[in-house]
Amino acid sequence: MVHLTAEEKNAITSLWGKVAIEQTGGEALGRLLIVYPWTSRFFDHFGDLSNAKAVMSNPKVLAHGAKVLVAFGDAIKNLDNLKGTFAKLSELHCDKLHVDPENFKLLGNIIVICLAEHFGKEFTIDAQVAWQKLVAGVANALAHKYH
């Protein structure tokens, strides 16, 4: 379980209200597929993922990335119950999709990178600390079924 202070929760929620879900989600998932190309095996039904341009313009990548960030929105609404919030997704990713749980950490870190890029100076060190804790908590919750 990740412990977030009131200040960290505020840092997360104050930025979250300004996040462009579709844009940031698509960018994050696209970057995951480009930077860590072995992750594309989970998305072979998405069509052309042969190069960066194809990935970043692929409508299925963009839509699924948005779906991922919507799930992060659920996490933000339930910061004190991440395992419960992600129980069904953990089961899906473990039992049916067989996703290596390390990929959750990779995607979480890429989400932080995207937020830092989009928010610039507004994404302070304190905000990064809070977001890193959140993505670690989400990755842990998604990996819960694996344990």
UniProtKB/Swiss-Prot annotation:
Instruction: Name positions with the PTM S-nitrosocysteine.
Output: 94
Record keywords, A-Z? Acetylation, Heme, Iron, Metal-binding, Oxygen transport, Phosphoprotein, S-nitrosylation, Transport
Species this protein is from: Notamacropus eugenii (Tammar wallaby)
Protein's UniProt name: Hemoglobin subunit beta
Q: Which PANTHER family match?
A: HEMOGLOBIN FAMILY MEMBER, HEMOGLOBIN SUBUNIT EPSILON
Gene Ontology biological process terms, A to Z: hydrogen peroxide catabolic process
Q: Which CDD domains match?
A: Hb-beta-like
Give all Phosphothreonine modified positions.
Answer: 13
Q: Name one GO cellular component term.
A: haptoglobin-hemoglobin complex
